[in-house]
């Protein structure tokens, strides 16, 4: 059966010149524990990151975003913070942080920290004092005495379920009350209805801004507020009827524990703190927000008519919806959905991987690694890359006895692999030496991937063509005017050929062709775009494509092999040479 997909097309106006540093920025997520170990303990650290900053500069990055580095008992690998103003000792200390910050400035890189405001560790002094009903801290968290249950017992005040399964309420014997935890029981939720909490968390931001950071990525934003208490009780959430497992968070529709109206005002208040600093030296501090929620809710993070919010509310349309068998038409749908929803005066961003998802090649297809990196670097505005995706790192199977991810460890040996995020967090593969050049330790915190001897930075940097070489060429090329300012016209031909054109009048245009299918397809550009020139110059293509860079090709008859991409250019009035 032949499937016909109608031609999709839409056009966006060109962007203005004089861009701020972040508006067309390339951001790189470093998972510090896995990036580079400088002291031989098998765990990555800040001095290791500092050692590799030159590499990040060389591959075209503008911003370096660090996953959490603050003091933590590591119940959730840094997302359970016991002191917001200290560095986790495994990663270094404040002096190591200062070395990192200074080196970033020297190289022209912007340092972004992970800010985890929804909760703390249960080992934080805030929580310990709250348990003791210290006058200052007694209402720093969400407490409730419980309601009467059978046989004169106390039961939780609502049916809320945590992200990590089971009740969101945990009984504290010392205080004789329940406390709320939307994540692990070791991660009690802060009470943002308390003005003292709001001010204290603003002061945490100021502390790190004073130390020179360029912004923050805000974790788990939709969970900041819950619906307020009414008549001594919290409102129950309705059943979703999508699962019969009452411990599963999907058992409920989270109408009371996510996306509350007060959340957006809190984001706007934090943006105001960042702007205080930006005004003092005319250097923009940025906010990224993480929220796995509906697209309209994500768009609200941008701000409104009276208040600015996050410059970069993470766009999860692709990461949440595109699968290994997705077509070009599918991909275009999710790209268009974001572009249609985004306010005209805001910047797009594209996120294809992170520490909570399987690696790009494992999730979407190893053959398509370059295809997706081509898309990431040529779609409008901001790109975010998870460490190792530039070389095509893949998930590494981790046996049960070496699994450390709390999400997996709370299951069992039969089912843990469905929950574990460890496979996408293995050490960075720098070279073919011991532990892939990550560490000199006898044992690393997670096993190094089995393929490190053939898949690493050193090998790819020396190859004639490789994922890394393609990535570096893309990041260099995307700084050109057509990709920083150009409008975009997207079309889908058949089911699997996605083609988009970026153009600047009187300068030229770039055409990006992505073949999501397994079969070769002729581009046929003259049938897709008006005034398409017959011949265009190859800028860069997937590793699977044999056509050399810089050659000119017939854009109607050129055949693009399956699961690959190519970038073509035509500069008006010039015979372009691509460096």
Swiss-Prot record:
Glycans are attached at residues 118, 151, 282, 304, 325, 401. One of its GO terms (biological process) is carbohydrate metabolic process. The keyword Phosphoprotein does not apply. It catalyses: Hydrolysis of terminal, non-reducing (1->4)-linked alpha-D-glucose residues with release of alpha-D-glucose. N-acetyl-beta-D-glucosamine binds at residue 325. It comes from the Eukaryota. It is found in: Secreted. Pfam families: Alpha-amylase (PF00128). Residues 1-18 form the signal peptide. The record marks 356 as: Transition state stabilizer. One of its GO terms (cellular component) is extracellular region. SMART domains: Aamy. Transmembrane segments: none annotated. One of its GO terms (molecular function) is alpha-1,4-glucosidase activity. Ca(2+) 2 binds at residues 118, 189, 223-224, 226. Saliva (at protein level). Proximal lateral lobes of the salivary gland (at protein level). Ca(2+) 1 binds at residues 37, 39, 41, 43, 45. This is Salivary alpha-glucosidase. It comes from Aedes aegypti. The lineage of its organism: Eukaryota, Metazoa, Ecdysozoa, Arthropoda, Hexapoda.
């Amino acid at each position: 059966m032949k499937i016909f997909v109608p031609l999709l097309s839409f056009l966006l106006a060109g962007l203005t010149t004089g861009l701020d540093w972040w508006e067309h920025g390339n951001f790189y997520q470093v998972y510090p524990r896995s990036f580079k170990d400088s002291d031989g303990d098998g765990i990555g650290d800040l001095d290791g990151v500092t050692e590799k900053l030159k590499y990040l500069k060389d591959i075209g990055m503008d911003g370096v975003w660090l996953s959490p580095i603050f003091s933590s008992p590591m119940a959730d690998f840094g997302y359970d913070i016991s002191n917001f103003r200290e560095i986790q000792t495994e990663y270094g200390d404040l002096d190591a942080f200062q070395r990192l910050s200074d080196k970033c400035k020297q190289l022209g890189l912007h340092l972004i920290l992970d800010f985890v405001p929804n909760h703390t560790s249960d080992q934080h002094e805030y929580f310990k004092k709250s348990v003791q009903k210290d006058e200052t801290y007694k209402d720093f968290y969400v407490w409730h005495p419980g309601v009467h249950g059978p046989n004169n017992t106390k039961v939780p005040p609502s049916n809320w379920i945590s992200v990590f399964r089971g009740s969101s309420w945990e009984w504290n014997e010392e205080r004789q009350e329940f406390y709320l935890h939307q994540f692990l029981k070791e991660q009690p939720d802060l009470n943002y209805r308390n003005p003292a909490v709001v001010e204290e968390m603003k002061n945490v931001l100021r502390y790190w801004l004073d130390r020179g950071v360029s912004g923050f990525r805000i974790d788990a934003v939709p969970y900041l507020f819950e619906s307020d208490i009414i008549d001594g009780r919290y409102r129950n959430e309705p059943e979703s009827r999508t699962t019969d497992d009452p411990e599963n968070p999907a058992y409920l529709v989270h109408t009371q524990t996510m996306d509350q109206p007060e959340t957006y005002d809190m984001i706007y208040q934090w943006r105001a703190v960042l702007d205080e600093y930006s005004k003092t030296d005319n250097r923009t501090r940025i906010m990224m927000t993480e929220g796995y929620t509906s697209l309209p809710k994500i768009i609200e993070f941008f701000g409104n008519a009276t208040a600015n919010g996050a410059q970069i509310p993470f766009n999860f349309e692709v990461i949440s919806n595109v699968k290994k068998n997705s077509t070009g038409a599918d991909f275009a749908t999710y790209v268009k959905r974001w572009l249609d929803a985004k306010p005209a005066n805001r910047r797009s961003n594209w996120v294809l991987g992170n520490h909570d998802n399987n690696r790009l090649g494992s999730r979407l297809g190893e053959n398509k690694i370059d295809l997706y990196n081509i898309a990431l670097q040529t779609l409008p505005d901001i790109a975010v890359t998870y460490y190792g995706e530039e070389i095509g790192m893949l998930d590494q199977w981790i046996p049960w006895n070496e699994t450390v991810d709390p999400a997996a460890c709370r299951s069992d040996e039969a089912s843990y692999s469905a929950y574990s995020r460890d496979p996408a967090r293995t050490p960075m593969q720098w070279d073919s030496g011991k532990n892939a050049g990550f560490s000199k330790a006898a044992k690393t915190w997670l096993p190094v991937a089995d393929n490190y001897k053939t898949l690493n930075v050193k090998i790819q940097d020396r190859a004639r063509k490789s994922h890394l070489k393609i990535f570096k060429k893309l990041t260099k090329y995307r700084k050109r005017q057509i990709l920083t300012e150009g409008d975009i016209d997207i079309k889908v031909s058949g089911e699997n050929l996605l083609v988009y054109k970026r153009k600047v009048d009187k300068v030229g245009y770039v055409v990006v062709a992505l073949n999501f299918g397994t079969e070769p397809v002729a581009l046929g550009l003259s049938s897709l775009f008006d005034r398409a020139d017959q011949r265009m110059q190859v800028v860069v293509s997937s590793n699977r494509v044999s056509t050399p860079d810089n050659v000119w090709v017939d854009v109607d008859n050129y055949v693009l092999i399956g699961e690959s991409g190519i970038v073509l250019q035509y500069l008006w009035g010039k015979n372009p040479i691509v460096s």
